[in-house]
């Protein structure tokens, strides 16, 4: 169909005609990268590492890739080991970033802290996705290797325990699984006895002029946090006047992002456990899925969640 009042323009999609092409383009074949192109891309790369540090040297890959020692003849145990080892590496980075952010908050250097907190949230997203890989293991596959695990359990992860303590979920009884390793026990105990990240943020609120109750600012750091009205009142002021308290407003949202991601990690842990072992007791002696479901009720930053109802 032609538009009213004249011929269809060249190349009009409704005319049935094709637009004219340059004569040269009609005869040119598309360029297909060949061996010469590939050679040009790496021929200047260093190939001799007999006297210099290589990629594998820098990353200590020999040690990392030689750290998987399945105890069973079952094919699926390698997945189980690597899943947990990589999770421990991500937790190591999460602890490193959280402690860096904590140091920044103590010196009122909030922009660097925001960057580190955002990174921790992305790390937690990686940990959430990792459960999708482990969930490819079926109940029968796990049952074949479970007898070889003994009493070992993720419940005994000292990095996870430090992460919980650093985020404020304190419980002195959780030191006991590490009593057989004095070096590890000292690390975990130090995290238990120190202010959590959120404790330092509450101190920041006080430094910014908010009237925080003295008993909230100096307390027994080994005890879990409880909701504090003066802290919620401070956050209420921040949320009602974000332009006046922009850094604190951004801090609040970074913390909510962080706890949101942490909750998702916990939830995927529960569903993966239920999918693979159902409601059996955990290898470490916990009730398994019911224990993990109970942990879903733990709130790390209570005032930041409750203030949303008050607003």
UniProtKB/Swiss-Prot annotation:
Keyword annotations from UniProtKB, A to Z: Dioxygenase, Heme, Iron, Metal-binding, Oxidoreductase, Tryptophan catabolism
Region (Disordered): 1-37
Involved pathway(s): Amino-acid degradation; L-tryptophan degradation via kynurenine pathway; L-kynurenine from L-tryptophan: step 1/2
Residues the record lists as binding substrate: 80-84, 142, 146, 283
Signal peptide, first to last residue: none
GO molecular function: heme binding; metal ion binding; tryptophan 2,3-dioxygenase activity
Obligatory cofactor(s): heme
Name of one Pfam family that matches: Trp_dioxygenase
Entry keyword annotation includes Disulfide bond: no
InterPro entries in alphabetical order: Trp/Indoleamine_2_3_dOase-like, Trp_2-3-dOase_bac, Trp_2_3_dOase
Binding site for heme: 269
Compositional bias segments (type: Low complexity): 17-27
Function text: Heme-dependent dioxygenase that catalyzes the oxidative cleavage of the L-tryptophan (L-Trp) pyrrole ring and converts L-tryptophan to N-formyl-L-kynurenine. Catalyzes the oxidative cleavage of the indole moiety.
Family: Belongs to the tryptophan 2,3-dioxygenase family.
Subunit text: Homotetramer.
Protein name: Tryptophan 2,3-dioxygenase
Source species of the chain: Burkholderia cenocepacia (strain ATCC BAA-245 / DSM 16553 / LMG 16656 / NCTC 13227 / J2315 / CF5610)
